[in-house]
Curated annotation (Swiss-Prot):
GO terms for molecular function: rRNA binding; structural constituent of ribosome. Part of the 50S ribosomal subunit. It comes from the Bacteria. The keyword RNA-binding applies. Pfam families: Ribosomal_L6. This protein binds to the 23S rRNA, and is important in its secondary structure. It is located near the subunit interface in the base of the L7/L12 stalk, and near the tRNA binding site of the peptidyltransferase center. One of its GO terms (cellular component) is cytosolic large ribosomal subunit. This is Large ribosomal subunit protein uL6. Disulfide bonds: none annotated. It comes from Alteromonas mediterranea (strain DSM 17117 / CIP 110805 / LMG 28347 / Deep ecotype). Belongs to the universal ribosomal protein uL6 family. Keywords: Ribonucleoprotein, Ribosomal protein, RNA-binding, rRNA-binding.
Length: 177
């Protein structure tokens, strides 16, 4: 049985929640997020709290309720505070430059990589080797950061590549004769 599902999600001031059937819409200062949830879970609002309640007749309703509660918490946190992922570039000539909703990356290929940001996501480059991805949707922010990292993941011998700022890359020793 899920213990996470039993904890209610606190709705902070400045955040509006509207529930219609299985569709939940959360509005805040950072934007609006809408999501349709599984039929095994009922989302209920009591004053300034949201609850994910499992429905009878579904085998995995408690597990689904825990997942829904975590997603609701991320939605409330996203529209009030937002999420961000920091990436760093390590390597000779590796550079990043934000231009509006596009990110230009020079990663040692014969051509520059241009990454178009999805709607609701902003990107900043405080320096040529740092990238900050920001947005209200936790899943999309993480996916964009993973896509950017995927162009040149850190390699284990020299550590060159695109990595998360808090990532620890395991280094290997070069083969010896």
């Amino acid at each position: 049985m899920s213990r996470i599902a039993k904890a209610p999600v606190d709705v902070v001031s400045g955040v509006e929640v509207s529930i219609s059937g299985q569709e939940v819409t959360v509005k805040g200062s950072k934007g609006t997020l809408t999501r349709v949830f599984n039929d095994a879970v009922e989302v209920a609002q009591e004053e300034n709290q949201l609850k994910a309640l499992p429905r009878e007749g579904f085998a995995d309703s408690w597990a689904q309720a825990g997942t829904v509660r975590s997603i609701l918490n991320a939605m409330v946190q996203g529209v009030s505070q937002g999420f961000e992922k920091k990436l760093t570039l390590l390597g000779v000539g590796y550079r990043a430059q934000a231009q509006g909703s596009k990110l230009n990356l020079t990663l040692g290929f014969s051509h520059p990589v241009v990454y178009e940001m999805p709607e609701g996501i902003t990107v900043e480059t405080p320096s040529q080797t740092e990238i900050v991805v920001k947005g209200a949707d936790k899943q999309v922010v993480g996916q964009v950061a993973a896509n950017i990292r995927g162009y040149r993941p850190p390699e284990p011998y020299k550590g060159k590549g695109v990595r998360y700022a808090d990532e620890n890359v395991r280094r290997k020793e070069a083969k010896k004769k």
